Amino acid sequence: MNSGRSLPSAITLTMIFEASALNRDEKIGGNIPSIKKLTRFGSKTYSYLSKVAMRHYLFETLNKLYGDDWKPAGCVESGSGDNKVVQFDITKQNILTHAELDAFGYMYTIGGQQGISRKGCVGITKAIALETWEGDMQFNANHDLARRPGTDPNPVNKEEHVSYY
């Protein structure tokens, strides 16, 4: 019997972890892959891992550790022209056959009709760096490959940030 106390409806997990900014944003100047960043408190820049990237890395880890229970759900391309979408194929799988659909939820659109959606029980938010990004860059060139045919190397720069998130 409940005796008047409310039961918890959710569990929240908050964690701090050290990582590199693993997801990239648009390229700057053609050959500089940038990290995802946001500006706060006037002019301080912080990198972040998007919730899409967090979901990706979490699912990939679960799939590697528990492959039989966390197999990837199949996807289909639906729609036509500029209205094409890639989505889970819920006509052939469901929350009982694929833990991914149960845990993270889904939205399934049907052209011209109301879509079907299921809110996942695992909610994920973006991970924002606890330390500011100070413009760190990695400079690379393919010297080894360019040397083989006797051509010039192609320089590539990329933004980097290691922080606690």
State where each predicted segment sits.
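RNA-binding basic/glycine-rich loop and surface signature characteristic of RAMP-family CRISPR effectors
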Residues: 1-165
